[in-house]
Every structure is written in structure tokens, then in C-alpha cells.
Swiss-Prot record:
Gene source species: Mus musculus
Stated name of the protein: BMP/retinoic acid-inducible neural-specific protein 1
Record's note on what induces expression: Up-regulated upon differentiation into neuronal cells in the presence of retinoic acid and BDNF. Up-regulated upon differentiation into astroglial cells.
Location of the MACPF domain: 68-251
Signal peptide location: 1-16
GO biological process: behavioral fear response; brain development; cell population proliferation; cellular response to retinoic acid; central nervous system neuron development; exploration behavior; gene expression; homeostasis of number of cells within a tissue
Primary site of residence: cytoplasm
One protein family per Pfam: EGF_BRNP1-3
Reported function: Plays a role in neurogenesis, brain development, and the functioning of GABAergic neurons. May suppress cell cycle progression in postmitotic neurons by inhibiting G1/S transition.
GO cellular component: cytoplasm; glutamatergic synapse; synapse
Recorded name of the encoding gene: Brinp1
């Protein structure tokens, strides 16, 4: 039989019944993404992924156009059925197949391999047959939109998308006018790409204004596409193997066998394709997409900072005084324009966060059987507290082209880029009590005027009625030895006699200029015994020095614990020097020339100088070594044993540096009695206001010399220690005096009390 005649018969069997339907018009606007759930399993396979529309959408999506809107109308449709496949009895009436297809089936044999099926059948003819479908023509307008660009151009992406939808809906009414306006928007914004297509079906009489003449498979709710596996036309013994081969081709790209066990399916990779389970191309696309989403997240924050609402908010902030986080928050909440812009940012970042999470879940799901481990971190949302801190940094840490981060607790900037030029002058704090009433016009960091009851002194506000010269009659806080820190360091290096304080060395465990074993705790004290010898003075420590000699090749490094009693008392009434903490200095170790001796120096300076009566020094080595203890605990040790003597050290000199302040105990005791008397008489503060102010000033100046403490903890109360040990007051008298001063400070002066911790 002639082959052309056989082909005509087969065509008549396949395209059975034809019916003509009127044309229709459908708009379709959807947010479509390249990868849907399980879409990677069939990526780059089948006719759909090689179609013109899909490839166009993939390319647009990679360019940033994540939203597709399509309005189209179909016309001249025919419903077709494959009547040959509908036959139930394929044995008596076999399907008329092409000779080439029949020859390919015969070449398979009875037990073909998966690769034979793929190369011979699947790659040539596919995996499915068309059972029924709809043919026709289509006229469509497709818009690809980048919502992020629309948001930046118009300020509201939702309204812009709706306006474009309304404009596109008039395409079939006024095609030329609609296309002209859309092209103007495309050129001016770059946020949309417009494509129009007109495809006609085979058999139409008129092909005018058509881009192509070909059959179009239409698919809608009314016109569904029905497919069936190609195995139905194979012999019985080949059907199961064909299904396995088709699944291996679709799911594993022909690089392995598709197997299912325990409700889990995977690809059993061939030796030449060990990574067949890993869709590396899709993973790279998702990683690139996540990187772009992270950039878009950062750009959203920059867009808010560059917006007109944020800039106008920054301009309206007052610059004549310091703004705390709380005051900035108040201005932030009162700016309605900024609030509406901030809500848009929150909604945009929330939508972006959900997209990132969905993409990240897909990415990690694809990487389950990959050697490639994805590294992705979800961008952190900037909280309102971080926004306020950002505003503060823009106000005070944005100078000379540099920028940094502002720390409100320290009122300073941490500049980025290893520079200190980003900090602007920090304005003064305006408030009540000892805060400024107005900042200085000449130097905004200093006070220009003070509140009632305070006077301006060196840019600070101090209580107006305090006579500092009168308090000097009680304790001479200001002396000729108030040197600068550099001067003090120079005088300590020279061992200046003016800073030499005569103390008494006391120790039952150590003798000066005698070697001892430091691996056991040793204690020594330096005391003044002012209550017996120098009752008219209190003493200030500004530094310490020790000369320690070690045996040759010694590996020990001694460690010191120093406790200070400010005004005598027991050991429990002392405080420990926090070396290296809270800005407190450390010991400086300098080796002496041509000797095994070292000078250990501690310079407190003006910042950390404090009162002292007795200094307790505990010495211990930094390493634990085998027990070699001097049983006597005193006297010279045996240095003849080389295994022992390398651990011994000796202290040849211990010295405290400082100066003494004149202290009028009788005059101060009489002032304290007046304070105590006013408290017991029912708070008659007005009659003794000068004494109250004087005692408040003395208490403040004494407690100001207290040692540093951890942030959030109260300072030590040195004033009460002075009342107890130098004025010999009882605990009840000390409580009454402090309570009277606190009442006067809060009720009369309207100042807040500073919390202190009990030491004595």
C-alpha cells in the first residue's frame, strides 16, 4: 500500500471529530515563579520547558521581572479526539503505527535495558499520547513587571499594578492607544516589558496580522488537555519496563534508575553520574535568587533612609541639645508621614521574608542528597530600637565623610574604618536639677545656663550655695600635689620623695630581702595607724611599687590580690582592686638592668586615686607546681637544692605612693552633730541649710573617690566608713546622718539620691 495513503488514514483516525466554537476573551494575571513545588524534577525536559512562552518567562524572571500579567482571547477552536486510542480491543484492531516506530519496538527485544528504551523510544517519541485537546488561535498581550522598581518610582507598587491592569484591559477595545501608552511607561520606568502575540490555527482562511500560522493547544477550565502514557500501545511484556524507563528519564534525567522504597523515592545514580540526585543548576539559581533577595532587603532599608519622609524627619529633630533614645522615639511616633512610610517598609519586608523562607526551604530540600551544602542566613529585621539607634548615629557620628555607631551609655562614637574623625560635638543634656537649662552657643557640649539653685562652673552646673572654700576647712581636698597623670608617672619613675608615704610593713609569712616559696598564699600589709600616730590627716593613694627578685631560669609569674581599707577597720571592710576591669589600670612590670629583679608598678593616677589606711597584699604564683613547702614558714630557705631554688622569689621593697590631706576631726564632728540634731528635732532643715549643703558636698566629694564597680551596681559608701572609723560614730548615728542628708537632698533641693553600697 502506498505510504501516503497509510499516513492519510492515520491522520483521519487521530483527528476524529471537529467542532467550531465562537471566540472568547480571558484576562489572566498571575504571580508566576520559575520553580514551583517538584518543578525541578522535570526541569529542562519535555515540550513545555522548551516552549517559547516558558523560555521567555524564565529569561524575564532572571532579569527581575517576577510578575506576569496576560490578557488574551481565543478564537476558532476545534475539539479533537484520538479515536484510534479509544478502541478497547487493541488485539483485534491494533493501532496503525508508523513503520519506523514499529521497527524501533522490534529492535528493543524482550528484555531491553533502561538506556535502550530512552535512546530508542523516549528521546524520539516522548512518554505520552494525546487523547483529547482543543486546537485554535490566540491573541494575547503579556506584561512582565518588576514590582520593586514600580515601588521606587511611584511609592506604592500595589496601586501601580492595579493601574497597569486597568490600562491593559482596554487592549482589545483600543489596541493602538493602549500599546502607545504601555510603551511610554516601559521606556520611562524600565519596570515593565510588553509583548503582544497573535497566533492563528491551521485551516483559517485569513492570516492577516498573524505572527505565526500554527495549531495552538488551548487549555482552560473548559478546554482540558488529556494525556495517556505511551505504554498502552506497547506489548504487555514491555509496558512495566517502559514505565520504569520513563520515570528514570523524567526524574533522573536518564542518569540513573528511579527506585522507591519505604514510601521514599530517589535516583540510584549510575557510576558515571554520581550527582544525579543533585539538581545543581536549580540550586545555583536558587542561591542566586536568595542573594538578590538579600540585596533587595538591604536596599529596602536604604530606600527608607533616602526617602523624603525620613529626610524631613531628620531635619525637624532639634539640634540645640542632646537627644536620647527615648526623646527620638517620641519624635518618631509623632511624625505621621514617617509612620505611614515605615508601615509600607514593614509590609514589604514581611512579604520579602516569606519569599526568602519559601525559597530557602526549597533550596534545603533540593540539597538533601547533594554534596553541596547550602549556606544561607535569613536577613535580620531591623527593630524599632535599632532604627532609633541608627538615627542617633546619623546625628552624632556622621562627620568629615566618615560614619560610625553611637553608644549612648558612653556618649561617644565607635567610628568605622579605623578612624576617630566621625564624631561630631555631642550636645549637652537639658533637664532638671544639675542638668543644663540651655547649651552654650560657643561650645554646644557645655552648659550655657543652669536651672534655679545651680551655678555655671566650667561648663557644668553645680549647687549654688555650696562654698568649696569652707569645706576645705574640714578636709583639704585640694593640695599642691594634684599633678596631671603624665607628671605623676614621671615622679613615680623618679621615686620623688614628695609622693612617698611612710607606712609600716607587717607580715607573719614574708620577710623583706628573704627568699620564699610563692606557690602558697603569702600575706603582707602596709598600714599607717593614723588613729594613733597621725590623727589630723587622711591619706590618698595614687600608686604602688614592689621590687621582686627571682632565681635564674625561674618560670613563676607572681599574681597579686590587693585589698584596701580606706579608713582603717577590719579586713572585711576593705575592697579588692579590680585590675584591668572597668578601665582600672594593671601592674606594669619592668626588668632592672643586669639583675633578676623586676619593678612592679601600679599607677592609679587622678582618675582612680582613693583613700587608704591599710593595704593588704596577697601573693600567689600563676601556676600550680609540685609541693615544695618551707615547713618553718619563716627565715631563710635552703637554696642548695637546685630543684627547689628555681621556684623561690624575694621582695626587697614595697612602697605606697600618695599624699596626706589635712583632716579637722573636731570641726567635722560638730557639723555632723548639727545634722543629727536637726534630724531628731523633726527635720528643721531650713535653720541649718548651710550645714546640710556643706555635708552634702563633703559626702559627694568623698564618695566620688570610691573604686569602680560593674555597670548597674551602686558605688561603695566611703563617707560612712569615715564617720565610723575617724569620727567614732555608732551605726545608729551614721544611719541618722545619712537619712537626714538624703531627705534634704530630695525634699529641699529636689535632687535624686545616688544609691550606695555599704562597706563598713
Amino acid at each position: 500500500m502506498n505510504w501516503r495513503f497509510v499516513e492519510l488514514l492515520y491522520f483521519l483516525f487521530v483527528w476524529g471529530r471537529i467542532s467550531v466554537q465562537p471566540s472568547r476573551q480571558e484576562p489572566a494575571g498571575t504571580d508566576q515563579h520559575v520553580s514551583k513545588e517538584f518543578d525541578w524534577l522535570i526541569s529542562d525536559r519535555g515540550p513545555f520547558h522548551h516552549s517559547r512562552s516558558y523560555l521567555s518567562f524564565v529569561e524575564r524572571h532572571r532579569q527581575g521581572f517576577t510578575t506576569r500579567y496576560k490578557i488574551y482571547r481565543e478564537f476558532a477552536r476545534w475539539k479533537v479526539r484520538n479515536t484510534a486510542i479509544e478502541r478497547r480491543d487493541l488485539v483485534r484492531h491494533p493501532v496503525p503505527l508508523m513503520p519506523e516506530f514499529q521497527r524501533s519496538i522490534r529492535l528493543l527485544g524482550r528484555r531491553p535495558t533502561t538506556q535502550q528504551f530512552i535512546d530508542t523510544i523516549i528521546k524520539k517519541y516522548g512518554t505520552h499520547l494525546l487523547i483529547s485537546a482543543t486546537l485554535g488561535g490566540e491573541e494575547a498581550l503579556t506584561m512582565y513587571m518588576d514590582k520593586s522598581r514600580l515601588d521606587r518610582k511611584s511609592g506604592n507598587a500595589t496601586q501601580s499594578v492595579e493601574a497597569l491592569h486597568q490600562l491593559a484591559s482596554s487592549y482589545f477595545v483600543d489596541r493602538d492607544g493602549t500599546m502607545r501608552r504601555l510603551h511610554e511607561i516601559q521606556i520611562s520606568t524600565g519596570a515593565i516589558k510588553v509583548t503582544e502575540t497573535r497566533t492563528g490555527p491551521l485551516g483559517c482562511n485569513s492570516y492577516d496580522n498573524l505572527d505565526s500560522v500554527s495549531s495552538v493547544l488551548l487549555q482552560s477550565t473548559e478546554s482540558k488537555l488529556h494525556l495517556q502514557g505511551l505504554q498502552i500501545i506497547f506489548p504487555q511484556y514491555l509496558q512495566e519496563k517502559f514505565v520504569q524507563s520513563a520515570l528514570s528519564y523524567i526524574m533522573c534525567n536518564g542518569e540513573g534508575e528511579y527506585v522507591c522504597q519505604n514510601s521514599q523515592c530517589r535516583c540510584q545514580c549510575a557510576e558515571e553520574f554520581p550527582q544525579c540526585n543533585c539538581p545543581i543548576t536549580d540550586i545555583q539559581i536558587m542561591e542566586f535568587t536568595l542573594a538578590n533577595m538579600a540585596k533587595a532587603w538591604t536596599e529596602a532599608y536604604k530606600d527608607l533612609e533616602n526617602s523624603d519622609e525620613f529626610k524631613s524627619f531628620m531635619k525637624r529633630l532639634p539640634s540645640n541639645h542632646f537627644l536620647t533614645i527615648g526623646s527620638i522615639h517620641q519624635h518618631w511616633g509623632n511624625d505621621w508621614d514617617l509612620q505611614s512610610r515605615y508601615k509600607l517598609l514593614q509590609s514589604a519586608t514581611e512579604a520579602q521574608r516569606q519569599k526568602i523562607q519559601r525559597t530557602a526551604r526549597k533550596l534545603f530540600g533540593l540539597s538533601v542528597r547533594c554534596r553541596h551544602n547550602p549556606n544561607h542566613q535569613l536577613p535580620r529585621e531591623r527593630t524599632i530600637q535599632q532604627w532609633l539607634a541608627r538615627v542617633q548615629s546619623l546625628l552624632y557620628c556622621n562627620e568629615n565623610g566618615f560614619w560610625g555607631t553611637f553608644l549612648e551609655s558612653q556618649r561617644s562614637c565607635v567610628c568605622h574604618g579605623s578612624t576617630t574623625l566621625c564624631q561630631r560635638p555631642i550636645p549637652c543634656i537639658i533637664g532638671g536639677n544639675n542638668s543644663c537649662a540651655m547649651c552654650s552657643l560657643a561650645n554646644i557640649s557645655l552648659c550655657g545656663s543652669c536651672n534655679k539653685g545651680y551655678k555655671l562652673y566650667r561648663g557644668r552646673c553645680e549647687p549654688q550655695n555650696v562654698d568649696s572654700e569652707r569645706s576645705e576647712q574640714f578636709i583639704s581636698f585640694e593640695t599642691d600635689l594634684d599633678f596631671q597623670d603624665l607628671e605623676l608617672k614621671y615622679l613615680l619613675q623618679k621615686m620623688d620623695s614628695r609622693l612617698y608615704v611612710h607606712t609600716t610593713f607587717i607580715s607573719n609569712e614574708i620577710r623583706l630581702d628573704t627568699f620564699f616559696d610563692p606557690r602558697w598564699r603569702k600575706r603582707m600589709s602596709l598600714t599607717l595607724k593614723s588613729n594613733k600616730n597621725r590623727m589630723d590627716f587622711i591619706h590618698m593613694v595614687i600608686g604602688m611599687s614592689m621590687r621582686i627578685c627571682q632565681m635564674r631560669n625561674s618560670s613563676l609569674d607572681p599574681m597579686f590580690f590587693v585589698y584596701v581599707n580606706p579608713f582603717s577597720g577590719s579586713h572585711s571592710e576593705g575592697w579588692n582592686m579590680p585590675f584591668g576591669e572597668f578601665g582600672y589600670p594593671r601592674w606594669e612590670k619592668i626588668r632592672l638592668q643586669n639583675s633578676q629583679c623586676y619593678n612592679w608598678t601600679l599607677l592609679l593616677g587622678n582618675r582612680w586615686k582613693t583613700f587608704f589606711e591599710t593595704v593588704h597584699i596577697y601573693l600567689r604564683s600563676r601556676t600550680r607546681l609540685p609541693t615544695l613547702r618551707n615547713e618553718t614558714g619563716q627565715g631563710p630557705v635552703d637554696l642548695s637544692d637546685p630543684s627547689k631554688r628555681q621556684f623561690y622569689i624575694k621582695i626587697s621593697d614595697v612602697q605606697v605612693f600618695g599624699y596626706s590631706l589635712r583632716f579637722n576631726a573636731d570641726l567635722l564632728r560638730s557639723a555632723v552633730q548639727q545634722v543629727n540634731q536637726s534630724y531628731t528635732q523633726g527635720g528643721q532643715f531650713y535653720s541649718s541649710s548651710s550645714v546640710m549643703l556643706l555635708m552634702l558636698d563633703i559626702r559627694d566629694r568623698i564618695n566620688r573617690l570610691a573604686p569602680p564597680v560593674a555597670p548597674g551596681k551602686p558605688q561603695l559608701d566611703l563617707f560612712s566608713c569615715m564617720l565610723k572609723h575617724r569620727l567614732k560614730l555608732t551605726n545608729s548615728e551614721i544611719i541618722r546622718v545619712n537619712h537626714a542628708l538624703d531627705l534634704y537632698n530630695t525634699e529641699i533641693l529636689k535632687q535624686s539620691d545616688q544609691m550606695t553600697a555599704k562597706l563598713c
